[in-house]
Amino acid sequence: MTQKEKNETCIHVTVSGKVQGVFFRESVRKKAEELQLTGWVKNLSHGDVELVACGERDSIMILTEWLWEGPPQAAVSNVNWEEIVVEDYSDFRVR
């Protein structure tokens, strides 16, 4: 395992609050691309947003902190995340 591989991780996240209809997914995509992360983000039927993000641990931590703020119109009440097995995505997509 290379040093780069040791420094990479993936997380599965659920974000709750006023996070739909406020450009949350597009804002997550832009932030993830800025941080050179890969993965996806999508709305859930009950109003939360779900995402998987993969990349360097430092960038993942920056994203998890940013998720508490989100775009200006959002009102985040909870960010629940867990590390998962590293997956190989080529980019970051809105689903």
Curated annotation (Swiss-Prot):
Organism: Coxiella burnetii (strain RSA 493 / Nine Mile phase I)
Database matches in PROSITE patterns: ACYLPHOSPHATASE_1, ACYLPHOSPHATASE_2, ACYLPHOSPHATASE_3
Protein name (Swiss-Prot/TrEMBL): Acylphosphatase
GO MF annotation, one: acylphosphatase activity
Active-site residues, record numbering mapped to chain: R25, N43
EC number of this enzyme: 3.6.1.7
Pfam families: Acylphosphatase (PF00708)
Entry keyword set: Hydrolase
Presence of the UniProt keyword Acyltransferase in the record: no
Annotated Gene3D superfamilies: 3.30.70.100
